[in-house]
Amino acid sequence: MTQLFPGPIVRTPGLAELDARARDIFRRVVESYLETGEPVGSRTISKGGVALSPASIRNTMQDLAQLGLLDAPHTSAGRMPTHAGLRMFVDGFLEVGDVAEQEKRAIEARLAVKGRSFEEALAEASSILSGLAGGAGIVVTPVREGGVKHVEFVPLGGGQVLAVMVFEDGQVENRLMRQAPGVTPSALQEASNFLNARLRGRTLTEARTEMGGELDAARRQLNETAARLVEDGLAAWSGGEGDARSLIVRGQANLLADARAREDIDRVRQLFDDLEQKGQLIGLLDDVRDAEGVRIYIGAETRLFSLSGSSVIAAPYMTGRQKVLGAIGVIGPARLNYARVIPLVDYTARVLGRMMDG
């Protein structure tokens, strides 16, 4: 089920190069660290039923540290796995089970709610993963291939306007925009008519490519308010960049829940900065689109998350005909519960794909 991203450039030993004692102690250290988030001392290992003295365990842990698999924080005599050590553990020791039946039913029920727009369903999938996995849920929306059928601007009051785009395949995308109070119904209708005349039948990518020159025409032909609606609507639907896809992130607050020390707070702040890099994140998840099953990125294996030391677990979601639509996953600290999160991501991606078919 799991296809893994290659390890870091710096060479680390393989499992075959570790003797049985080293493998056993290494596994116990990593499992304890993933459970508690705390460095693991030799006495903790000896209490777990290992028939070795604490001194022998310390010597083995020192050997593992010299191999680049374990490290010691400055404030503790205990050891914790390096990112290379976590990679070895995930590839060689991790036992991945199945999602609990109760959680399967909960995922299916929350994604089966009728009346949602396409993007609202994707946002719900991101929220589901965030809540179950304890990290931030991420989804990259598909590239829209269907043409636009209808565009409308709906006033909501309080300086807010809902931009509604209906596609030929029946999907609907909504964007909430802020406008100066007092936008008139005539300006909303004028902007809608202008876009409908030019966007009908075009994909979002085509619209963004071809509408750049039309904005000047909009400014000449429409009043100032209607022209601004046209410009803001196009920017909102296309994400404001050259890529017509959107990145949906939910559950960032979960990333703060596990922060214990100043170093953890700094790491989370860096991760928040990383999550603002939409283009790089979509580029990373594009690699996931080409994978079979779940991909795992740990810390420095990606340039984007090397400073925050975060991990990404993601999978493509696709139609029953194996057409890849996008990618969905979880971002969190390197000590994510991989055995739990991997099957959650895999199952949610498959349910989401079935829902897109329906």
Curated annotation (Swiss-Prot):
Pfam families in UniProt: HrcA
Organism: Caulobacter vibrioides (strain NA1000 / CB15N) (Caulobacter crescentus)
InterPro entries: GAF-like_dom_sf (IPR029016), HrcA (IPR002571), HrcA_C (IPR021153), WH-like_DNA-bd_sf (IPR036388), WH_DNA-bd_sf (IPR036390), WHTH_transcript_rep_HrcA_IDD (IPR023120)
Alphabetized GO MF terms: DNA binding
Family: Belongs to the HrcA family.
Keyword Kinase set for record: no
Role, per record: Negative regulator of class I heat shock genes (grpE-dnaK-dnaJ and groELS operons). Prevents heat-shock induction of these operons.
Cross-referenced PANTHER family: HEAT-INDUCIBLE TRANSCRIPTION REPRESSOR HRCA
Domain of life: Bacteria
SUPFAM superfamilies: GAF domain-like, Winged helix' DNA-binding domain
GO biological process, one term: negative regulation of DNA-templated transcription
Coiled coil: none
Annotated HAMAP family: HrcA (MF_00081)
Keyword tags: Repressor, Stress response, Transcription, Transcription regulation
UniProt name for this protein: Heat-inducible transcription repressor HrcA
